[in-house]
Amino acid sequence: MTQAATRPSNDAGQDGVTEPDILAVARQQVLERGEGLNQEQVLQVLQLSEDRLEELLALAHDVRMRWCGPEVEVEGIISLKTGGCPEDCHFCSQSGLFSSPVRSAWLDIPSLVEAAKQTAKSGATEFCIVAAVRGPDARLLSQVAAGIEAIRNEVEINVACSLGMLTAEQVEQLAAMGVHRYNHNLETARSYFTNVVTTHTWEERWQTLTMVRDAGMEVCCGGILGMGETLEQRAEFAANLAELDPDEVPLNFLNPRPGTPFGDLEVLPAGEALKAVGAFRLALPRTMLRFAGGREITLGDLGAKRGILGGINAVIVGNYLTTLGRPAEADLELLEDLQMPLKALNASL
């Protein structure tokens, strides 16, 4: 056994036998066999010392390259309906229950189409229409249908949606509209969810996701790291996602919003955030892992490069729903510098 494979572990048994090093285990289990780490193994990765971060990121990158390939999928998002949401997601400035500065507003169809055009020009293959709602009503679904039709008439791009929790009938309607992928985040570990949301349950979200998959749409499901969860709960969340097995996992990092219950939380340290990126890649070797909201404030420009070389293989370009993102040009230049090709539209269809 190599030196790397026999590093001391806090989990050594009472007989004094040293446990195998978790990254050596991951190299065999994940890199060679494509089997994701389980919850306990992910926790061991999250507990690694800072001096092993680069080793972790290098392994996560190797896993991503072997099981996902070099291509990076680029996506843009737009808010069709902003603010006024009746739910109490403690991280979200769009809740109508908090004293945040975001106010309710709707986007018109011509503006939606123009946003899709600009997104496609950036090289993106996915354009996600988002609404701040518990779930869509008839008016919203009608607006979404009109928007999708208008986009398809003028723009060559996949259309995704994120419209909250759905009924079985609404799932079928969206599938019939040609929605390529549906985003609905579990947000955090099942055991921590009630600390984040109280107006609906984790199980309700899970039910929507299973119906989406059954209807033939791709499933996009991730969450936000740095909302006060423990490392154990972060590992649990990775295991929850592995059980769901979505097509895409967007990783957000809390960007505390004024007026929300989480507005005074500390931003996740960059090293801890990158360690989570590597750990989630080792838990989900074949899944599209997307850099999403909060990466700018958490990681900065250097962190974007380290994440893409540490397991990430998809990005959201431009701005987010209520916060500013990196300019699309900055991300595209970075990908070009790293010689990472953009995923082509025909490979996404």
Swiss-Prot record:
Keywords: 2Fe-2S, 4Fe-4S, Biotin biosynthesis, Iron, Iron-sulfur, Metal-binding, S-adenosyl-L-methionine, Transferase. Pathway: Cofactor biosynthesis; biotin biosynthesis; biotin from 7,8-diaminononanoate: step 2/2. [4Fe-4S] cluster binds at residues 85, 89, 92. [2Fe-2S] cluster binds at residues 128, 161, 220, 290. Its cofactor is [4Fe-4S] cluster; [2Fe-2S] cluster. It catalyses: (4R,5S)-dethiobiotin + (sulfur carrier)-SH + 2 reduced [2Fe-2S]-[ferredoxin] + 2 S-adenosyl-L-methionine = (sulfur carrier)-H + biotin + 2 5'-deoxyadenosine + 2 L-methionine + 2 oxidized [2Fe-2S]-[ferredoxin]. One of its GO terms (molecular function) is 4 iron, 4 sulfur cluster binding. Residues 70-295 form the Radical SAM core domain. InterPro entries: Aldolase_TIM, BATS_dom, Biotin_synth/BioAB, Biotin_synthase, Elp3/MiaA/NifB-like_rSAM, rSAM. It is an enzyme of class 2 (transferase). Its EC number is 2.8.1.6. SUPFAM superfamilies: Radical SAM enzymes. GO terms for biological process: biotin biosynthetic process. It comes from the Bacteria. SMART domains: BATS, Elp3. Binds 1 [4Fe-4S] cluster. The cluster is coordinated with 3 cysteines and an exchangeable S-adenosyl-L-methionine. Binds 1 [2Fe-2S] cluster. The cluster is coordinated with 3 cysteines and 1 arginine. Homodimer. Catalyzes the conversion of dethiobiotin (DTB) to biotin by the insertion of a sulfur atom into dethiobiotin via a radical-based mechanism. Belongs to the radical SAM superfamily. Biotin synthase family. This is Biotin synthase.
